[in-house]
């Protein structure tokens, strides 16, 4: 299965595939609204005829429908990006859109519980860092319709225990007992912040 995903702010492909009967489908460009997934903020994709052709060929080779398109909100895109980043997957806004689309596909029964999904994240999150900062600072412009969730804000945090006297620095590495003390105290502090306990 291939699942396409579009924001409700830029969704001409999604709207095209809303019509279940291929013979009745008519492609209509849309006027896009501000979207965090800027690389996908296209209201009239020039490659749409090719997309339709390839999707039809792919569907025709399978015994059942294999091409799907889902729609997500800007809120879902940003929340998904932040969830991915909190869990160690550095995702851009388009990656957040992919993750939100996978969730929607599961909710709609397109992707079954026993199936595995592969998500496409097209860029490094640093390319779209301003959107993460807007999420942290509650500074999204109203047209994005994004209201940050406090629990998803993953601010960078300085970790330096008060009892730690020596830390490694450029040109000043630690060794021996100093390095051992640094590793032990930093590990203990991180475990404390995360609420981890020894097993």
Model-assigned labels for residue ranges:
Residues 2-7, 117-121:
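Extended hydrophobic secondary-structure segments that form protein cores and membrane-embedded regions
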Residues 1, 63-65, 110-114:
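Short helix-terminating capping/connector loops at secondary-structure junctions
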């Amino acid at each position: 299965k291939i699942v396409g995903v579009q924001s409700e702010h830029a969704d001409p492909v999604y709207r095209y595939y809303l019509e279940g009967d291929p013979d009745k489908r008519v492609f209509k460009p849309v006027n896009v609204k501000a979207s965090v997934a800027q690389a996908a903020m296209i209201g009239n994709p020039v490659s749409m005829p090719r997309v339709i052709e390839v999707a039809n060929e792919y569907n025709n080779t399978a015994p059942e429908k294999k091409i799907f398109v889902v729609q997500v909100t800007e809120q879902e895109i940003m929340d998904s990006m932040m969830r991915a980043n909190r869990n160690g997957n550095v995702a851009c806004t388009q990656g957040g859109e992919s993750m939100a689309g996978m969730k929607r596909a599961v909710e709609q029964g397109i992707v079954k519980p026993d199936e595995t999904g592969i998500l496409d994240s097209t860029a490094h999150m640093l390319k779209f860092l301003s959107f993460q900062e807007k999420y942290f600072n509650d500074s999204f412009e109203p047209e994005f319709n994004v209201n940050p969730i406090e629990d998803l804000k993953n601010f960078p945090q300085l970790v330096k225990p008060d009892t730690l006297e020596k830390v490694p620095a450029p040109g000043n590495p630690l060794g021996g007992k100093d390095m051992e003390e640094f590793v032990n105290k930093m590990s203990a502090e991180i475990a404390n912040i995360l609420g981890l306990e020894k097993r």
